[in-house]
């Protein structure tokens, strides 16, 4: 049985996450630093409870009959084996028996779509309109499941089979990912960062779908490549490895802190073909000086992140300014396009589910940039020996179909003249 203080802790943390604007993992780290007397098992209970509540918040609020965080936590516990009596023994003052009865008689198939899918109203309206209700529900249910742990093998240092074997020797067997030719997968969370394989730079943790974005660019040795929104550099590192540590990859980002986090990863990887470039905005002089000189540009644009809800379930409960996001995406794509030389390639990608951030951005771009034309994703994937077919020119990945995070990517070629 959970200690009374743990229910209170979980409720406090849940409330701070859903009412704040700081990512759940950072808030959780901060909370545990402020409560150092909490043991490992207790921290595990609180973290698992809070993430469970974030994933299926609408369901637990339905059972609780309201949105009080402590009631939400209680409903979660009732759905995970606790009895009303056990809750009452923790000092819980809510209607434990009424909630337990609602749990016992619950028929999820009769619930409103938003509750079944555990989505906020704005997403519960958009996704059925975009995908149709059955597909939207399957997608939402998959997004509410924890993601597996995917690894990308650093092919500059080792082959996939070698890393798989060495991880097994260290007690962490993995399976090859079905699509990425350099991916490995664990279904559970284990301390992989403590392995000698990780310390030696043989792999990075990276979702399989994210690995496919770099393949869409098809960078070659000795080329000049730009990762326009590099962040902490997961795709930058992959691009550098795909180029066999030759040529140059420029990692652009507006956040110095994110680029700083890339530096130890670069050192561990053994790559020396990556250059980090801090920029103030997409029109920065450091961007302009490369205009028309770059062979390939990847734009993994800042987005709503709605495709990453398996890992970041708190995102869906925050308000987003979609017009501001899409305006920014349009400006970034236009600026990045200016870098591409004739015959070069531009890949626009997001981890968003929303058409407004994906197809609409590309369609608007092509309407004013006839010098670019789409390259079918299926052709690229076939060349890279990825066993995936796509219904149209875009790469579209979804957790209920591919067991990856949701990604969108469109490859565009600049005409020679």
Which residues does each PLM region occupy?
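Rossmann-like S-adenosyl-L-methionine
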Residues: 161-417
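Class I Rossmann-like S-adenosyl-L-methionine
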Residues: 1-194, 293
């Amino acid at each position: 049985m959970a200690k009374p203080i743990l229910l209170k802790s979980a409720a406090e943390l849940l409330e701070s996450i859903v009412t704040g604007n700081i990512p759940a993992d950072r808030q959780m780290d901060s909370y545990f630093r402020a409560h150092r007397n909490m043991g490992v098992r207790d921290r595990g209970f609180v973290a698992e409870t809070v993430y469970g509540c974030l994933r299926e918040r609408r369901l637990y609020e339905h059972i609780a009959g309201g949105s009080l965080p402590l009631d939400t936590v209680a409903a979660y516990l009732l759905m995970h084996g606790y009895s009303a009596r056990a809750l009452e023994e923790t000092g819980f003052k809510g209607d434990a028996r009424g909630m337990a009865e609602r749990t016992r008689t619950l028929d999820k198939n009769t619930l409103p779509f938003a509750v079944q899918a555990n989505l906020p109203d704005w997403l519960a309206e958009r996704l059925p309109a975009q995908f149709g209700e059955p597909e939207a529900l399957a997608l939402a249910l998959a997004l509410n499941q924890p993601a597996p742990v995917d690894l990308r093998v650093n092919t500059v240092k080792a082959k996939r089979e070698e890393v798989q074997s060495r991880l097994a020797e260290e007690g962490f067997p993995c399976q090859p990912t079905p699509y990425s030719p350099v991916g490995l997968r664990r279904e559970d969370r284990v301390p992989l960062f403590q392995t000698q394989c990780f310390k030696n730079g043989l792999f990075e943790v990276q979702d399989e779908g994210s690995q496919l974005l770099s393949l869409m660019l098809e960078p070659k040795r000795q080329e000049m490549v730009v990762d326009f929104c590099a962040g902490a550099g997961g795709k930058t590192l992959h691009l550098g490895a795909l180029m066999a540590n030759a040529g140059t990859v420029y990692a652009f980002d507006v956040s110095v802190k994110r680029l700083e986090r890339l530096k130890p990863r670069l050192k561990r990887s053994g790559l020396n073909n990556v250059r980090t470039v801090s920029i103030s905005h997409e029109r920065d002089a450091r961007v302009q000086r490369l205009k028309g000189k770059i062979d390939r540009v990847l734009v993994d644009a800042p987005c709503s992140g709605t495709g990453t809800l398996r890992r970041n379930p708190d995102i869906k409960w925050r308000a987003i300014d979609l017009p501001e996001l899409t305006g920014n995406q349009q400006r970034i794509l236009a600026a990045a396009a200016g870098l591409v030389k004739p015959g070069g390639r531009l890949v626009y990608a997001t981890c968003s589910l929303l058409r407004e951030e994906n197809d609409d951005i590309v369609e608007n771009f092509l309407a004013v940039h006839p010098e670019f034309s789409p390259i079918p994703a299926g052709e690229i994937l076939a060349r890279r020996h990825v066993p995936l077919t796509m219904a149209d020119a875009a790469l579209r990945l979804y957790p209920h179909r591919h067991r990856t995070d949701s990604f969108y990517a469109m490859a565009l070629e600049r005409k020679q003249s």
